[in-house]
Amino acid sequence: MTQVAKKILVTCALPYANGSIHLGHMLEHIQADVWVRYQRMRGHEVNFICADDAHGTPIMLKAQQLGITPEQMIGEMSQEHQTDFAGFDISYDNYHSTHSDENRELSELIYTRLKENGFIKNRTISQLYDPEKGMFLPDRFVKGTCPKCKSPDQYGDNCEVCGATYSPTELIDPKSVVSGATPVMRDSEHFFFDLPSFSEMLQAWTRSGALQEQVANKMQEWFESGLQQWDISRDAPYFGFEIPNAPGKYFYVWLDAPIGYMGSFKNLCDKRGDTTSFDEYWKKDSTAELYHFIGKDIVYFHSLFWPAMLEGSNFRKPTNLFVHGYVTVNGAKMSKSRGTFIKASTWLNHFDADSLRYYYTAKLSSRIDDIDLNLEDFVQRVNADIVNKVVNLASRNAGFISKRFDGVLAAELADPALYKTFTDAAESIGEAWDSREFGKAIREIMALADVANRYVDEQAPWVVAKQEGRDADLQAICTMGLNMFRVLMTWLKPVLPQLAARAEAFLNSELSWDAIQQPLLAHKVNPFKALYNRIEMKQVEALVEASKEEVKATAAPVTGPLADDPIQETITFDDFAKVDLRVALIENAEFVEGSDKLLRLTLDLGGEKRNVFSGIRSAYPDPQPLIGRLTVMVANLAPRKMRFGISEGMVMAAGPGGKDIFLLSPDDGAKPGQQVK
């Protein structure tokens, strides 16, 4: 079916320029690249762009820690990111940076238009300020005790223990992450974007039917709770663009970051000497299509602030947002300690790009669902699908064509009706690629791969080859098998670019979507070479181990007690809440006959007596001074039968052992039986 060529601009979210690309990032870039490659195969004009998000306090501070300029750091990071994306065959037309002349000019233009149109408001706000560093502190650069659950060492915007959200001014005993100083409140004039003015427009955009249902529903919740003005300014020192006519004030990173999409495209147009396409794609009444592939964590910025900024500055809005979920590994959040926080470059040292591209694609849909990279399932699926079903189809037929017929295919198909079954599926598979129902496309392709392999099993060319006078049948059967392989690889070309290139070299023919309607007949193919190798679990094990070693190599060296006794794996707040710690009075302390390690402690919990055996004798050779002391015990530990009697709990102590054991005691005023929280 002939399609009208469309003009399409596609972006991925801009990776932040202070860290390496990992497998979580790669989900989005692979998803977008598969979609883009399909659109290009169908003859559409696609511009696929990205850039590094290169501004903000974290980049400024990390560069200071490294002893280099922010410009040097983001330059090195950009090269690393581009190398990683190229290694995964992400086919960007341009990869730029938000720290660019194009982005500065466009940010200033959009801000000026918003200001002229009355959408920028000024007001004075109070913020936490680091008096030692001389800087205002973003929420994530303040830590203190959670005002809700009282957990220490929590960020200024939310508690990672109980999940509560709050403002940094609500923290108990806040400290600057930058200097350790106690921050003070200080006033500053800030600039705000009047987002509520665009509420009606945004609601109409939400109801247009273009957005994913889950995105539209979430936006409706935000509308119902009321849109707020958005602070788009930050005070010096700050790494970014200074706001015009506002010395010492800088654009907040989230203002110029999405403008980076425009900046990267402008840079691409300038490189091409193209003076018309930028306006053609970004003008208010543009008929070009604009799609942003993003993660679900940044929907708020892309569905509210970004279209409102564009509307208020007389530019076009996105055609749609394509939102995906997070990546887990082996059913859990990526973990550095378990070796499942895997960098893109580390993956490529152990596996090819096609393998991960295939696995992610097979699991993706148009919904905002999390994707689990189960490493054992990954090995099984790649071997079962790519090797056993697709590549094996070629290897089972190619040898006969090469050896018996000098590489020349038959002049006719053995089963034209079966071939038509394959080509007829192009429409539904194409629709699945187009609508981002990638898993559905893969399932349909693999079902047809099964059909193709059954055909070869039934025709048994290895048997026919031994039968006199059946050369024509053998050539026709193998020609049929290789043509079905060609069709399958054409459909998989957006997913497996490296394998597709090897298949094209073998078939001596480009894999083109429309070309499959005409089978390869009386056509000479090249000698068959192995197209893809099986993968093994030992490669996964090596990958995980390498990831662990990378973490060790980059981690700051641990000294002191933590080096000898590392912190245990993280537990949940619910797990911790199960432990009942109580203040206890030591009524009696005595030696245990037959043991040179234990003391027998009689503890008073405020009306309840407990008998506890504790291995602290080496540090307290005379137990008498312990009598009358307060300590802390685990009160709900199951009783443990010992040969000296039953131990009904555990007292808390610190230290490595031997003489260095220190019984914990609460401050004066604590009472026996009180819970330790």
UniProtKB/Swiss-Prot annotation:
Give the catalysed reaction(s), semicolon-separated.
tRNA(Met) + L-methionine + ATP = L-methionyl-tRNA(Met) + AMP + diphosphate
Q: How is the cofactor bound?
A: Binds 1 zinc ion per subunit.
Q: What is its main location?
A: cytoplasm
Name of the protein described by the UniProt record: Methionine--tRNA ligase
Instruction: Describe the task this protein carries out.
Output: Is required not only for elongation of protein synthesis but also for the initiation of all mRNA translation through initiator tRNA(fMet) aminoacylation.
Cofactors (names)? Zn(2+)
Organism in which the protein naturally occurs? Klebsiella pneumoniae subsp. pneumoniae (strain ATCC 700721 / MGH 78578)
Q: What is its EC number?
A: 6.1.1.10
Name the enzyme group at the top EC level: ligase
Q: Which UniProt keywords apply?
A: Aminoacyl-tRNA synthetase, ATP-binding, Cytoplasm, Ligase, Metal-binding, Nucleotide-binding, Protein biosynthesis, RNA-binding, tRNA-binding, Zinc
Q: Which domain of life is it from?
A: Bacteria
What the entry lists under Pfam families is as follows: Anticodon_3, tRNA-synt_1g, tRNA_bind
Coiled coil location: none
Q: Which GO terms describe its molecular function?
A: ATP binding; metal ion binding; methionine-tRNA ligase activity; tRNA binding
Q: Which residues form the tRNA-binding domain?
A: 575-677
